[in-house]
Each structure stands twice: as structure tokens, then as C-alpha cells.
Regions:
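Rossmann-like AdoMet/SAM-dependent catalytic core
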Residues: 1-126
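Long, charge-rich, low-complexity alpha-helical segments
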Residues: 23, 107-168
Length: 168
């Protein structure tokens, strides 16, 4: 151990990263490679997260965009909606909103920066409620979007939901 520490010190090494590799046979399906940077604190053990991840990916692999939009979802317990504001330096008083994000408070603690529209849509998710497409449609109607804008929003929402599912 001391020899390695001396080698690192002599070589100017300031940090050593550790990682995980999870491999699963998905049969004849096209190979999938996902690389994640876990530079945030996380909660051990990550083993249960790996199995959940593979389950989520199996579902996503078999789902089309239409399937995503016609499905109903639950927000995972422990998800935090964070609104971060910083002191307003221009006015010298109060705060200015800077970022809104969804953050897992368990496992790998993934975080996603989102906007108000995504926050509203995710807030409407309920496994016994409306499918994603209808939640998007309601949001679009409430915000005066034209049909083509609603279709674009639905497509974008499906992609965002896929990313959120991927991260649990």
C-alpha cells in the first residue's frame, strides 16, 4: 500500500475514481451501452438499483413512443422537486430562480434539471390516473398551445419520461 501511495504522490495523482460495470445478456436484442458518471453522493448498496435498472430497461426496450405516451406512471417515493434560487445581485434584495430539478433521494441519487412544464406534467402522473398523453394534452390546453405545438410537446415529454424512467 505504501508503495502505491508513494507512486501516486510522485506521479502527481490527486484522485482515484472507482466505477461499476453491470453486464446482462439481452439475447438477440441489439447491444445497449450506457455510461453514467456518478459524481454525486449515493446510497449503498447499489445492487438493488442494478436489478431495478435492468427491469426498467427491459420495459423501455419493448416500448414504442406511442406506448410511452399511452402509459400511466407513478412518481417514485423519495423524489424531490427542488427549486433553487440565488440572491438577486442586480436588485440587492430577494432571490432569483436559477434551476428546478427532480432528484432521487435514494440509491444513485440521479438528478434532472427540468422546466415548469415538465414539473407540472410529472406532478400529474398517477398510476390510476390519466396516461401521459392526456396529461400533456391537458397542460397544452391550459397553456394555449396549438395542436402542432401539443404534438411536439408530447414527443418531447415521451423522451423526458424515458430518461426519468432510466434513472428510476
Amino acid at each position: 500500500t505504501q508503495a502505491w501511495l508513494k507512486h501516486f504522490r510522485d506521479a502527481g495523482v490527486r484522485a482515484v475514481g472507482f466505477g461499476w460495470i453491470f453486464i446482462r445478456d439481452i439475447g438477440d436484442a441489439p447491444s445497449e451501452l450506457t455510461f453514467e458518471t456518478l459524481d454525486q453522493p449515493f446510497t449503498d448498496p447499489l445492487g438493488p438499483e442494478v436489478e431495478e435498472y435492468f427491469t426498467r430497461m427491459d420495459w423501455l426496450r419493448g416500448s414504442t413512443q406511442e406506448d410511452i405516451l399511452e402509459s400511466r406512471y407513478a412518481v417514485r417515493p423519495g423524489i424531490a422537486l427542488e427549486d433553487v434560487s440565488l440572491a438577486d445581485a442586480d436588485s440587492g434584495m430577494g432571490f432569483t430562480p436559477k434551476v428546478k430539478r427532480l432528484t432521487r433521494t435514494d440509491g444513485p441519487r440521479f438528478t434532472h434539471d427540468i422546466d415548469d412544464a415538465v414539473a407540472s406534467i410529472v406532478s400529474g402522473l398517477n398510476p390510476a390516473g390519466l396516461p401521459l398523453r392526456e396529461i400533456v394534452s391537458l397542460w397544452a390546453a391550459a397553456n394555449g398551445l396549438a395542436d402542432e405545438q401539443e404534438e411536439k410537446l408530447a414527443s418531447e415529454a415521451a423522451g423526458i419520461i424515458v430518461d426519468l424512467i432510466r434513472h428510476g
